[in-house]
Amino acid sequence: MAASLPLVFTAPKRGMPPRHLADLDSAERKEAVKELGLPAFRADQLARQYYARLEADPEKMTDLPASVREKVGESLFPTLLTPIKHLACDSGDTRKTLWKAHDGTLLESVLMRYPDRATLCISSQAGCGMACPFCATGQGGLDRNLSTAEIVDQVREAAAAMRDGDVAGGPGRLSNVVFMGMGEPLANYKRVVAAVRRITSPAPDGLGLSQRSVTVSTVGLAPAIRKLADEGLSVTLAVSLHTPDDELRDTLVPVNNRWSVSEVLQAARYYADKTGRRVSIEYAMIKNVNDQPWRADMLGKKLKKALGGLVHVNLIPLNPTPGSEWDASPKDVEREFVRRVIAQGVSCTVRDTRGQEIAAACGQLAAEN
């Protein structure tokens, strides 16, 4: 195994983009408009353009006087993300976008269309500091946090692409957002929570998605899980557990050296109790590493004890990453694992894997141009 990378919780303080409308809450928007010498009603007008009409170019905002569009653009609508390329697979139902930020930082998002929904997987950091050895993003290290607006703009762009029929299947609606792209969302806590509020608030304060259709994933930053539980949000929490025992998890998910399996599950229980939401447990099935029958039994028992009925296990067939020595578990091993977890009274299914051939699946995002 390659030498392990250090854990990085604090991102370098560099490269953050200029202020954007999506960084601001309602009061801050009004103040920003006032600074520009515009009447207060323009604040809601601009927000409706961005959040309801999904328009980020003031030159196309026809209800805005032509004389102020340039000033508004410079002050509140800097170009945050420029698409470098789109890659599609799964008959066009999966589209990965490589974005370039204002400072040249690269990041990725993945739009997945299903018969009954459209889900966007978004990044919260450029790179990741959690150093999980089976994940391409974690092996690349952390460049920087994304701003609230950089996170929100990934969602606005996908919502516009769905509305305009820019993806296979014709026009539709973006229904779900998962913070499962690049980065550890809870290590960029303040901006991620602000982004969740923008994504879920109704216009003119946000994009109007249901909180229940938003999932925030974490490798298990226990104090931040508890903090999120107290935010008054009802988003789904997904915990990347990957093994039920501390000995292996210390290697697979290095943050386990800081917060053990039991501490993470206690925090998850607190989240479930506070929100009434079932917690998702993510488990990448790695051949001969974490797929043994006894680990399935232990996982089921620990989850049943910690979370009762407020838990669901998503088994994820390991997605290949460059240079990795690990493989996905065989299907018969996968099936037996599911059977054993369910036998302990815990809900468990295998996730439908999308985007593997364009390196858009879980653990594959590396933002390579």
From Swiss-Prot:
[4Fe-4S] cluster binds at residues 128, 132, 135. Residues 114-351 form the Radical SAM core domain. Its cofactor is [4Fe-4S] cluster. Binds 1 [4Fe-4S] cluster. The cluster is coordinated with 3 cysteines and an exchangeable S-adenosyl-L-methionine. Keywords: 4Fe-4S, Cytoplasm, Disulfide bond, Iron, Iron-sulfur, Metal-binding, Methyltransferase, rRNA processing, S-adenosyl-L-methionine, Transferase, tRNA processing. One of its GO terms (biological process) is rRNA base methylation. Its main location: cytoplasm. S-adenosyl-L-methionine binds at residues 183-184, 217, 240-242, 319. The active site is at residues 108, 362. GO terms for cellular component: cytoplasm. Disulfide bonds join 121-362. Its EC number is 2.1.1.192. It catalyses: adenosine(2503) in 23S rRNA + 2 reduced [2Fe-2S]-[ferredoxin] + 2 S-adenosyl-L-methionine = 2-methyladenosine(2503) in 23S rRNA + 5'-deoxyadenosine + L-methionine + 2 oxidized [2Fe-2S]-[ferredoxin] + S-adenosyl-L-homocysteine; adenosine(37) in tRNA + 2 reduced [2Fe-2S]-[ferredoxin] + 2 S-adenosyl-L-methionine = 2-methyladenosine(37) in tRNA + 5'-deoxyadenosine + L-methionine + 2 oxidized [2Fe-2S]-[ferredoxin] + S-adenosyl-L-homocysteine. GO terms for molecular function: 4 iron, 4 sulfur cluster binding; metal ion binding; rRNA (adenine(2503)-C2-)-methyltransferase activity; rRNA binding; tRNA (adenine(37)-C2)-methyltransferase activity; tRNA binding. It is found in: Cytoplasm. Belongs to the radical SAM superfamily. RlmN family. Reaction proceeds by a ping-pong mechanism involving intermediate methylation of a conserved cysteine residue. This is Probable dual-specificity RNA methyltransferase RlmN. It comes from Rhodococcus erythropolis (strain PR4 / NBRC 100887).
